[in-house]
């Protein structure tokens, strides 16, 4: 007999693993970047809306609160969450809003406060904890960490389910629920955690996520590695032949997505995706993915696109004067 925490854990020892390949919920790469790096080995194919790429706006908002952890709740953070809901509903009245807390009692406190506010609409608002958001999605997610130093200035919270086995998976689910924006409300800073707490995988990852949101909300660029090659590298690349600066525009690699081979920029603004018969085609699972699914995803995100193949290059048929 074998003792195991779950059927998933038991099956993982006997069956081949297949990685999730794509993410279609989030409008910006930054919203999925943390999970892609920590959970999916940067394998997720994701494409941001072209207008958001050109706006260079951060999808994150960080609200620092001097809250106190008392009786399993943080009143100061709850008040900040209620005010943030009010602001979102004024600026984006049609948005769905999901408030995600890290423990049940904080969720109940926020719900009670919201019920007492007549100007807050509850039709498109859901208040949940980290354990029951699987399958949900919202236009704007408001995270309420809740955990904070106590009245004596010590961080002694046990971090609930986050610190238990599988806690990082709950965190992964929670931070990937947003389609457009995330607001993180927290009383914690990196140096609040002690070394014993950081030995726990879930707590350590929470600290890393808080730092990530802080950095991106301040305008720091994403650290995007080169897309991994799962089949083979081609020795002759049309993409490498035609990329460069031309009169009035540039053709350049777009490292933020593997759904295109090159991006065309005019006066610093992304204007079009170029699809060649290079690595993107080789990495595709089939011709339908390369010639149907990729263009459909580009169209859905507002990217104009055109195909340009090696045969056209050898026949000296120019691409926009190239």
Give the residues covered by each predicted segment:
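Coupling/hinge elements of helicase-like and P-loop NTPase modules
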Residues: 17-60
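Nucleic-acid nuclease catalytic cores
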Residues: 301-320
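Conserved helicase motor
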Residues: 103-104, 127-133
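Helicase C-terminal subdomain and adjacent C-terminal extension
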Residues: 1-14, 18, 36, 49, ...
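Conserved helicase/translocase motor-coupling segment
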Residues: 43-115
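Short beta-strand-loop-alpha-helix junction that forms the active-site gateway
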Residues: 263-293, 311-313
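Amphipathic alpha-helical transducer elements in NTP-driven molecular machines
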Residues: 4-5, 25-28, 78, 82, ...
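A short beta-strand element within the Helicase C-terminal
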Residues: 136-148, 156, 182-183
